[in-house]
UniProtKB/Swiss-Prot annotation:
It is found in: Cytoplasm, Cytosol; Cytoplasm; Rough endoplasmic reticulum. Residues 26-44 have a biased composition (Basic residues). It comes from Homo sapiens (Human). Its main location: cytoplasm. This is Large ribosomal subunit protein eL6. The lineage of its organism: Eukaryota, Metazoa, Chordata, Craniata, Vertebrata.
Length: 288
Protein backbone atom coordinates (compact mmCIF):
# COMPACT_ATOMS: atom_id res chain seq x y z
CA UNK A 1 0.00 0.00 0.00
CA UNK A 2 1.05 3.54 -0.77
CA UNK A 3 2.18 5.59 2.22
CA UNK A 4 2.83 2.59 4.40
CA UNK A 5 6.33 1.58 5.36
CA UNK A 6 7.18 -2.04 5.02
CA UNK A 7 9.30 -3.41 7.84
CA UNK A 8 12.32 -5.33 6.66
CA UNK A 9 13.02 -8.63 8.33
CA UNK A 10 16.29 -8.70 10.40
CA UNK A 11 18.87 -10.60 8.47
CA UNK A 12 21.30 -10.59 11.42
CA UNK A 13 20.91 -13.58 13.64
CA UNK A 14 20.92 -12.92 17.33
CA UNK A 15 23.57 -14.82 19.23
CA UNK A 16 22.16 -17.08 21.91
CA UNK A 17 22.84 -15.71 25.33
CA UNK A 18 25.22 -17.68 27.51
CA UNK A 19 23.65 -19.59 30.30
CA UNK A 20 24.91 -19.55 33.86
CA UNK A 21 24.40 -22.44 36.22
CA UNK A 22 23.84 -21.90 39.92
CA UNK A 23 25.13 -24.19 42.62
CA UNK A 24 21.59 -25.62 42.87
CA UNK A 25 21.60 -26.58 39.19
CA UNK A 26 19.36 -23.71 37.93
CA UNK A 27 20.35 -22.07 34.69
CA UNK A 28 20.78 -18.27 34.61
CA UNK A 29 21.04 -16.12 31.53
CA UNK A 30 23.84 -13.63 31.36
CA UNK A 31 27.12 -12.66 29.73
CA UNK A 32 30.23 -14.82 30.20
CA UNK A 33 32.48 -11.77 30.41
CA UNK A 34 34.42 -11.82 33.69
CA UNK A 35 34.70 -8.66 35.70
CA UNK A 36 38.09 -7.05 35.21
CA UNK A 37 39.83 -5.60 38.27
CA UNK A 38 40.12 -1.86 38.30
CA UNK A 39 43.56 -0.57 37.45
CA UNK A 40 45.05 2.72 38.53
CA UNK A 41 46.21 5.32 36.06
CA UNK A 42 49.74 4.66 34.81
CA UNK A 43 52.29 7.21 35.87
CA UNK A 44 55.98 7.77 35.42
CA UNK A 45 58.56 6.93 38.08
CA UNK A 46 58.42 9.01 41.24
CA UNK A 47 62.21 9.10 41.21
CA UNK A 48 63.40 10.94 38.08
CA UNK A 49 66.72 9.78 36.65
CA UNK A 50 69.54 12.33 36.71
CA UNK A 51 72.20 10.14 35.10
CA UNK A 52 71.89 6.54 33.95
CA UNK A 53 71.69 4.44 37.12
CA UNK A 54 71.44 7.44 39.52
CA UNK A 55 68.08 8.77 40.69
CA UNK A 56 67.25 12.18 42.13
CA UNK A 57 66.06 10.86 45.50
CA UNK A 58 67.86 8.46 47.80
CA UNK A 59 66.48 5.14 49.02
CA UNK A 60 65.36 6.62 52.35
CA UNK A 61 63.68 9.57 50.61
CA UNK A 62 61.77 7.21 48.31
CA UNK A 63 60.68 5.20 51.33
CA UNK A 64 58.79 8.22 52.65
CA UNK A 65 57.60 9.41 49.21
CA UNK A 66 56.01 6.02 48.47
CA UNK A 67 54.59 5.82 52.02
CA UNK A 68 56.14 2.41 52.46
CA UNK A 69 55.77 2.77 56.23
CA UNK A 70 51.98 2.33 55.85
CA UNK A 71 52.31 -1.15 54.38
CA UNK A 72 51.99 -4.04 56.76
CA UNK A 73 54.01 -7.20 56.34
CA UNK A 74 53.40 -10.45 58.12
CA UNK A 75 55.99 -13.21 58.28
CA UNK A 76 54.90 -16.74 57.47
CA UNK A 77 54.27 -18.76 60.58
CA UNK A 78 56.26 -21.96 60.78
CA UNK A 79 54.37 -25.14 61.64
CA UNK A 80 57.40 -26.67 63.35
CA UNK A 81 57.28 -26.27 67.08
CA UNK A 82 60.44 -24.94 68.64
CA UNK A 83 61.80 -26.91 71.53
CA UNK A 84 62.42 -24.88 74.62
CA UNK A 85 65.96 -25.17 75.90
CA UNK A 86 66.40 -25.84 79.55
CA UNK A 87 68.26 -23.05 81.29
CA UNK A 88 71.52 -24.08 82.88
CA UNK A 89 71.72 -22.91 86.45
CA UNK A 90 74.61 -20.59 87.21
CA UNK A 91 74.47 -20.95 91.00
CA UNK A 92 73.44 -23.50 93.60
CA UNK A 93 72.26 -22.82 97.13
CA UNK A 94 74.01 -25.00 99.70
CA UNK A 95 73.36 -25.29 103.45
CA UNK A 96 76.08 -23.98 105.74
CA UNK A 97 76.58 -24.94 109.36
CA UNK A 98 76.96 -22.43 112.17
CA UNK A 99 74.52 -20.10 113.94
CA UNK A 100 75.98 -16.84 112.64
CA UNK A 101 76.60 -17.93 109.00
CA UNK A 102 73.03 -17.42 107.73
CA UNK A 103 72.23 -21.09 107.15
CA UNK A 104 72.73 -21.07 103.34
CA UNK A 105 75.36 -19.97 100.87
CA UNK A 106 75.08 -19.30 97.09
CA UNK A 107 77.89 -21.08 95.24
CA UNK A 108 78.81 -20.54 91.56
CA UNK A 109 78.84 -23.70 89.47
CA UNK A 110 81.33 -22.25 86.98
CA UNK A 111 84.27 -21.06 88.99
CA UNK A 112 86.69 -18.44 87.74
CA UNK A 113 90.36 -19.37 87.27
CA UNK A 114 92.61 -18.87 90.25
CA UNK A 115 95.62 -17.69 88.24
CA UNK A 116 95.77 -15.41 85.19
CA UNK A 117 98.57 -15.03 82.62
CA UNK A 118 100.85 -12.03 83.09
CA UNK A 119 100.83 -11.28 79.34
CA UNK A 120 97.87 -11.30 76.96
CA UNK A 121 98.63 -14.03 74.42
CA UNK A 122 96.02 -14.57 71.67
CA UNK A 123 94.69 -18.10 71.45
CA UNK A 124 95.31 -19.90 68.18
CA UNK A 125 91.92 -21.12 67.01
CA UNK A 126 91.72 -23.86 64.40
CA UNK A 127 89.28 -22.67 61.76
CA UNK A 128 86.56 -24.95 60.44
CA UNK A 129 87.69 -27.41 57.79
CA UNK A 130 91.42 -26.85 58.25
CA UNK A 131 93.61 -29.69 59.42
CA UNK A 132 97.24 -29.70 60.57
CA UNK A 133 99.91 -30.74 58.06
CA UNK A 134 100.23 -34.19 59.63
CA UNK A 135 96.56 -34.94 58.77
CA UNK A 136 96.67 -33.75 55.14
CA UNK A 137 95.79 -36.25 52.41
CA UNK A 138 98.92 -37.24 50.47
CA UNK A 139 98.19 -37.40 46.76
CA UNK A 140 100.53 -38.70 44.08
CA UNK A 141 100.55 -37.89 40.38
CA UNK A 142 99.14 -40.66 38.21
CA UNK A 143 102.31 -40.67 36.08
CA UNK A 144 104.53 -41.46 39.10
CA UNK A 145 104.45 -45.13 40.09
CA UNK A 146 107.07 -47.30 41.88
CA UNK A 147 109.93 -47.94 39.45
CA UNK A 148 109.37 -44.81 37.32
CA UNK A 149 112.50 -43.00 36.11
CA UNK A 150 112.28 -39.34 37.25
CA UNK A 151 114.27 -36.28 36.16
CA UNK A 152 115.20 -34.01 39.11
CA UNK A 153 114.82 -30.29 38.24
CA UNK A 154 116.20 -28.55 41.36
CA UNK A 155 118.94 -28.95 43.93
CA UNK A 156 122.50 -30.22 43.67
CA UNK A 157 121.37 -33.23 41.58
CA UNK A 158 119.32 -31.26 39.05
CA UNK A 159 119.19 -32.79 35.60
CA UNK A 160 119.97 -36.29 36.85
CA UNK A 161 117.73 -39.29 36.32
CA UNK A 162 116.72 -41.35 39.36
CA UNK A 163 114.50 -44.33 40.24
CA UNK A 164 111.36 -43.69 42.30
CA UNK A 165 110.91 -46.16 45.18
CA UNK A 166 107.90 -45.03 47.27
CA UNK A 167 106.04 -42.04 48.74
CA UNK A 168 106.76 -41.22 52.39
CA UNK A 169 104.22 -40.15 55.05
CA UNK A 170 105.01 -36.44 54.51
CA UNK A 171 104.18 -36.74 50.79
CA UNK A 172 107.82 -36.54 49.64
CA UNK A 173 109.23 -39.07 47.18
CA UNK A 174 111.98 -41.53 48.12
CA UNK A 175 114.41 -41.89 45.20
CA UNK A 176 117.81 -43.43 44.50
CA UNK A 177 120.34 -43.00 41.64
CA UNK A 178 121.57 -45.73 42.09
CA UNK A 179 124.69 -44.24 43.68
CA UNK A 180 127.09 -46.28 41.51
CA UNK A 181 125.67 -44.91 38.25
CA UNK A 182 125.05 -41.18 38.84
CA UNK A 183 126.18 -40.46 42.45
CA UNK A 184 122.59 -39.82 43.69
CA UNK A 185 122.11 -41.45 47.11
CA UNK A 186 118.87 -42.40 48.86
CA UNK A 187 117.15 -39.06 49.34
CA UNK A 188 113.79 -37.29 49.47
CA UNK A 189 112.41 -34.97 46.79
CA UNK A 190 109.13 -33.17 46.09
CA UNK A 191 106.92 -34.29 43.22
CA UNK A 192 106.55 -30.68 42.03
CA UNK A 193 110.21 -30.58 41.03
CA UNK A 194 110.49 -33.79 39.01
CA UNK A 195 109.51 -34.88 35.49
CA UNK A 196 108.03 -38.37 35.26
CA UNK A 197 109.28 -40.24 32.19
CA UNK A 198 107.60 -43.14 30.41
CA UNK A 199 110.59 -45.40 31.24
CA UNK A 200 109.85 -47.78 34.11
CA UNK A 201 111.44 -50.80 35.77
CA UNK A 202 109.74 -53.53 37.79
CA UNK A 203 110.63 -53.14 41.50
CA UNK A 204 107.75 -55.19 42.92
CA UNK A 205 110.24 -57.71 44.41
CA UNK A 206 112.54 -55.03 45.89
CA UNK A 207 112.44 -54.95 49.69
CA UNK A 208 112.81 -51.40 51.02
CA UNK A 209 113.84 -51.19 54.72
CA UNK A 210 110.93 -50.06 56.93
CA UNK A 211 113.06 -47.58 58.88
CA UNK A 212 113.50 -45.38 55.77
CA UNK A 213 111.03 -42.72 56.97
CA UNK A 214 110.98 -38.92 57.20
CA UNK A 215 112.62 -39.05 60.63
CA UNK A 216 115.49 -41.07 59.11
CA UNK A 217 116.30 -38.31 56.58
CA UNK A 218 115.69 -35.34 58.89
CA UNK A 219 118.79 -33.26 59.60
CA UNK A 220 119.93 -33.38 63.19
CA UNK A 221 120.91 -30.04 64.72
CA UNK A 222 124.04 -30.07 66.83
CA UNK A 223 123.49 -28.55 70.27
CA UNK A 224 126.56 -26.99 71.84
CA UNK A 225 126.78 -26.39 75.62
CA UNK A 226 126.44 -22.72 76.52
CA UNK A 227 129.21 -20.59 78.04
CA UNK A 228 131.91 -22.91 76.78
CA UNK A 229 135.47 -21.63 76.98
CA UNK A 230 136.85 -20.33 73.74
CA UNK A 231 133.54 -20.51 71.86
CA UNK A 232 133.95 -16.94 70.59
CA UNK A 233 137.13 -17.78 68.70
CA UNK A 234 135.95 -21.14 67.31
CA UNK A 235 135.49 -20.59 63.56
CA UNK A 236 135.57 -24.20 62.39
CA UNK A 237 132.23 -25.66 61.34
CA UNK A 238 131.48 -29.32 61.82
CA UNK A 239 131.05 -31.09 58.49
CA UNK A 240 128.28 -33.56 57.78
CA UNK A 241 129.53 -37.12 57.95
CA UNK A 242 127.72 -40.08 56.43
CA UNK A 243 126.83 -42.67 59.04
CA UNK A 244 127.54 -46.37 58.64
CA UNK A 245 123.79 -47.07 58.72
CA UNK A 246 123.30 -44.92 55.62
CA UNK A 247 126.00 -46.83 53.76
CA UNK A 248 124.46 -50.20 54.68
CA UNK A 249 120.97 -49.11 53.58
CA UNK A 250 122.31 -47.68 50.30
CA UNK A 251 124.02 -50.95 49.41
CA UNK A 252 120.96 -53.00 50.42
CA UNK A 253 118.64 -51.06 48.08
CA UNK A 254 121.04 -50.60 45.15
CA UNK A 255 122.06 -54.28 45.12
CA UNK A 256 118.43 -55.18 44.36
CA UNK A 257 117.85 -52.49 41.70
CA UNK A 258 121.12 -52.72 39.71
CA UNK A 259 120.46 -56.23 38.24
CA UNK A 260 117.08 -55.05 36.92
CA UNK A 261 118.67 -51.99 35.32
CA UNK A 262 121.40 -54.07 33.67
CA UNK A 263 118.76 -56.41 32.20
CA UNK A 264 117.39 -53.55 30.06
CA UNK A 265 119.79 -52.49 27.26
CA UNK A 266 120.97 -48.84 27.20
CA UNK A 267 119.28 -48.07 30.55
CA UNK A 268 122.61 -47.70 32.37
CA UNK A 269 123.74 -45.03 29.92
CA UNK A 270 120.32 -43.35 30.15
CA UNK A 271 120.62 -43.03 33.95
CA UNK A 272 124.23 -41.78 33.71
CA UNK A 273 123.31 -39.02 31.23
CA UNK A 274 122.20 -35.57 32.42
CA UNK A 275 119.06 -33.88 31.08
CA UNK A 276 119.56 -30.40 29.60
CA UNK A 277 117.89 -28.10 27.09
CA UNK A 278 119.78 -26.68 24.11
CA UNK A 279 118.86 -24.17 21.40
CA UNK A 280 115.79 -25.21 19.44
CA UNK A 281 114.61 -27.76 22.02
CA UNK A 282 111.35 -26.79 23.73
CA UNK A 283 110.22 -28.66 26.89
CA UNK A 284 106.52 -28.45 26.01
CA UNK A 285 107.17 -30.31 22.75
CA UNK A 286 109.28 -33.09 24.27
CA UNK A 287 107.87 -36.53 25.01
CA UNK A 288 109.50 -37.96 28.12
Amino acid sequence: MAGEKVEKPDTKEKKPEAKKVDAGGKVKKGNLKAKKPKKGKPHCSRNPVLVRGIGRYSRSAMYSRKAMYKRKYSAAKSKVEKKKKEKVLATVTKPVGGDKNGGTRVVKLRKMPRYYPTEDVPRKLLSHGKKPFSQHVRKLRASITPGTILIILTGRHRGKRVVFLKQLASGLLLVTGPLVLNRVPLRRTHQKFVIATSTKIDISNVKIPKHLTDAYFKKKKLRKPRHQEGEIFDTEKEKYEITEQRKIDQKAVDSQILPKIKAIPQLQGYLRSVFALTNGIYPHKLVF
